[in-house]
């Protein structure tokens, strides 16, 4: 359960803007602010069951989006490739290293 919550908290950064403001606020309060269902319910003026339903449905949609789009997976692969480039850079001649620095800077901006 904890592992799934950590994964969803990470995936929020990639997909939360695709949801309406209310769903995003409830889901962020749960995963990012670590509020209880009761605390969120009181703040949003809905029942705890309503909060649970929103969080469950939003989580399912986020996992579906990641399965289909793979944005978090792509970001992870990009970061791994950048780390590998940075480690290789130091073993190359200075001129080549400078060119690789330009590529790394461009990739970090994407």
Task: Show where each model-derived region lies.
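Short, Lys/Arg-enriched N-terminal segment that forms or immediately precedes the first helix
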Residues: 3-15
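Intrinsically disordered, low-complexity basic tails/linkers immediately adjacent to helix-turn-helix/homeobox/MYB/SANT
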Residues: 68-94
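Short amphipathic alpha helix immediately N-terminal
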Residues: 21-33
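Residues within the DNA-recognition helix of helix-turn-helix
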Residues: 54-57
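Hydrophobic positions on the alpha-helical face of helix-turn-helix-like DNA-binding modules
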Residues: 26, 40-41, 51
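Helix-turn-helix DNA-binding motif, specifically the short coil turn and the N-cap/start of the second
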Residues: 47-48
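Generic L/I/V-rich hydrophobic alpha-helical segments across diverse proteins
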Residues: 82-85, 97-100, 104-107
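C-terminal flanking helix
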Residues: 59-66
């Amino acid at each position: 359960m904890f592992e799934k919550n950590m994964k969803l908290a990470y995936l929020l950064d990639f997909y939360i803007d695709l949801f309406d403001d209310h769903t995003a606020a409830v889901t962020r309060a749960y995963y990012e602010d670590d509020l209880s269902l009761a605390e969120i319910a009181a703040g949003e003026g809905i029942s705890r069951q309503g909060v649970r339903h929103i969080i469950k449905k939003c989580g399912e949609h986020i996992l579906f989006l990641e399965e289909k789009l793979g944005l978090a997976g792509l970001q992870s692969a990009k970061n791994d490739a950048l780390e590998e480039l940075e480690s290789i850079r130091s073993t190359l001649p200075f001129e080549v290293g400078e060119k690789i620095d330009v590529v790394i800077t461009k990739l970090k901006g994407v």
